[in-house]
Curated annotation (Swiss-Prot):
This is Histamine H2 receptor. GO terms for biological process: chemical synaptic transmission; G protein-coupled receptor signaling pathway, coupled to cyclic nucleotide second messenger; gastric acid secretion; positive regulation of vasoconstriction. Glycans are attached at N4. Residues 310-327 have a biased composition (Polar residues). SUPFAM superfamilies: Family A G protein-coupled receptor-like. Belongs to the G-protein coupled receptor 1 family. The gene is HRH2. It is a multi-pass membrane protein.
Length: 359
């Protein structure tokens, strides 16, 4: 999440530097918007993706899309112009939107980790644990927390040291004030506590994936075990690595500002860590959708402008012609133990022996 509504602006005096930064920020904004639009379209056009699990992914995509449309363009303009040109009223609205949307984005990531944890650790009770009502309540809770830490806190001045406005009249800057209490509460609720829980849940998920791979290895399928464990490791490392790299520097700076004061951090460094946090919204469509096999298929259908039903029928027709021959050739092997696939994380499957999961 982000507690800073805008971030400090530092002037880019060198034209080459200004051009480079402009290109980088523009590309980041376009990727954020396009990537999350594709996620929303994929779910809207593909019935197979309309599941409770993907409710959180869609919520994440909508949140990041709104961030890309309502916040990032103004952040980029402010960063490049070195002054806030939209007045005091819009400054408070802008900073509140920034805090709210970044908070909601991180809390959606947090809920995705809990959802996957329940699916992997207790798959039989998953339909009982994750119900439509509980998903709806979770989504409402995400936005209640986000609004409380953004619009409510900023407009009531709970975040300020001695003033209620984020706007500086002397120097036209728009920056959220951070006092000690707001910095600590916001940092803990929206980053450090979710980070701790996510580390625990993903470690448990990885451990289960590794145990399943070991069972396969003991049955002689060492190659499948190695591939499965490698996929689980890479996927979980990518998910947690991106989250920590993008947000940990920002929240460290944010809490430090609450402890030492708003001017305790170099403006250039503060701007870098702020945009590093924004970059997480561009990575989310890749990490939480592209790594999922069903999403990859939906992307292919979307870019080919072909409906999912057409692809399914075509695949079915192609496969039916050779199904009888394959069934006859596989008949002697059906007595052997068949593997099951456990989706450890979106797009990552580890094969496990049926006996290991039927117990």
């Amino acid at each position: 999440m982000i507690s800073n509504g805008t971030g400090s602006s530092f002037c880019l005096d060198s034209p080459p530097c200004r051009i480079t930064v402009s290109v980088v920020l523009t590309v980041l904004i376009l990727i954020t918007i396009a990537g999350n639009v594709v996620v929303c379209l994929a779910v809207g056009l593909n019935r197979r993706l309309r599941s409770l699990t993907n409710c959180f992914i869609v919520s994440l995509a909508i949140t990041d899309l709104l961030l890309g449309l309502l916040v990032l363009p103004f952040s980029a303009f402010y960063q490049l112009s070195c002054r806030w040109s939209f007045g005091k009223v819009f400054c408070n609205i802008y900073t509140s939107l920034d805090v709210m949307l970044c908070t909601a984005s991180i809390l959606n990531l947090f809920m995705i980790s809990l959802d996957r944890y329940c699916a992997v650790t207790d798959p039989l009770r998953y339909p009982v644990l994750i119900t439509p009502v509980r998903v709806a309540v979770s989504l409402v809770l995400i936005w209640v927390i986000s609004i409380t830490l953004s619009f409510l806190s900023i407009h009531l001045g709970w975040n300020s040291r001695n003033e209620t406005s984020s706007f500086n009249h002397t120097i036209p800057k728009c920056k959220v004030q951070v006092n000690l209490v707001y910095g600590l509460v916001d940092g803990l609720v929206t980053f450090y506590l979710p980070l701790l829980v996510m580390c625990i849940t993903y470690y448990r998920i990885f451990k289960i994936a590794r145990d399943q791979a070991k069972r396969i290895h003991h049955m002689g399928s060492w190659k499948a075990a190695t591939i499965g464990e490698h996929k689980a490791t890479v996927t979980l490392a990518a998910v947690m690595g991106a989250f920590i790299i993008c947000w940990f520097p920002y929240f460290t700076v944010f809490v430090y500002r609450g402890l030492k004061g708003d001017d305790a951090i170099n403006e250039a460094f503060e701007a870098v860590v702020l945009w590093l946090g924004y970059a997480n919204s561009a990575l989310n469509p890749i990490l939480y959708a592209t790594l999922n096999r069903d999403f990859r298929t939906a992307y292919q259908q979307l870019f080919r402008c072909r409906p999912a039903s057409h692809n399914a029928q075509e695949t079915s027709l192609r496969s039916n012609s050779s199904q009888l021959a394959r069934n006859q050739s596989r008949e002697p092997m059906r007595q052997e133990e068949k593997p099951l696939k456990l989706q450890v994380w979106s797009g990552t499957e580890v094969t496990a022996p049926r006996g290991a999961t039927d117990r």
